[in-house]
């Protein structure tokens, strides 16, 4: 399927916040409650429509363990968007956001659009981080923000598409040099070209829900 643009995303955050589950829900529309930790980096892709324009999202799901941080850092380069994920039931994952954000700002394109996601909002009875705290963190750091649930799919679609809409707006405003591949954006010329990984809407490798 042809696309106007290809946007590269990276998903970051602590181990166990549900990064791989968010990706699987977005690409395959299913929830897998138990699987292995993500080792290194995994990949998914899907076509979306933003403002009537077909856009392919190429999404890199990273391991949250400290031992993989150096690998994760190498994937910041060349990403147009990032989903920064914490678990609303685990306070420490929220407390670690500043460290993840510092990493992203240090190693990524300065114009990268970042969506902060408070995952597992279906477990509101176990909530350890208020929605207002998430909103405040996002406001202070210039991030988009949503609470979502990989289990129920609430706001999962919206998180990926709102990030794409922000990137598209930045292109239209002249923020990105789309001819530079390090921007994380490829122009599609109306046909699919050079897109690695599995077919649209699928994950080419297994995902790790806890990763």
From Swiss-Prot:
Keywords: Cell membrane, GTP-binding, Lipoprotein, Membrane, Nucleotide-binding, Prenylation, Protein transport, Transport. The keyword Ribosomal protein does not apply. Signal peptide: none annotated. It is found in: Cell membrane. It comes from the Eukaryota. It holds the Pfam family Ras. Its main location: membrane. A lipid is attached at residues 209-210 (S-geranylgeranyl cysteine). A motif (Effector region) lies at residues 35-43. GTP binds at residues 13-20, 61-65, 119-122, 149-150. GO terms for biological process: protein transport. It is a lipid-anchor. Intracellular vesicle trafficking and protein transport. NCBIfam families: small_GTP (TIGR00231). This is Ras-related protein RABB1b. It comes from Arabidopsis thaliana. The gene is RABB1B.
């Amino acid at each position: 399927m042809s696309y106007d643009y290809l946007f590269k995303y990276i998903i970051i955050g602590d181990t166990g916040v549900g990064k791989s589950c968010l990706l699987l829900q977005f690409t395959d529309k299913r929830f897998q409650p138990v699987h292995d930790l993500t080792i290194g980096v995994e990949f998914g892709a899907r076509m979306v429509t933003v403002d009537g324009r077909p856009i392919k999202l190429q999404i890199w799901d990273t391991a949250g363990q400290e031992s993989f941080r150096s690998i994760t850092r190498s994937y910041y380069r060349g990403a147009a968007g990032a989903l920064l994920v914490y678990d609303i039931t685990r306070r420490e994952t929220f407390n670690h956001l500043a460290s993840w954000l510092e990493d992203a700002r240090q190693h990524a394109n300065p114009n990268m659009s970042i969506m902060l996601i408070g995952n597992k909002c279906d477990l509101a009875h176990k909530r350890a981080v208020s929605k207002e705290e998430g909103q405040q963190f996002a406001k202070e750091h210039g991030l988009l923000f949503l609470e979502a649930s990989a289990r129920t799919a609430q706001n999962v679609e919206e998180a990926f598409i709102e990030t794409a809409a922000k990137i598209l707006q930045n292109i239209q405003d002249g923020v990105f040099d789309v001819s530079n591949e390090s921007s994380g954006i490829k122009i599609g010329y109306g046909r699919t070209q050079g897109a690695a990984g599995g077919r649209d809407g699928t994950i080419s490798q297994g995902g790790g829900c806890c990763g």
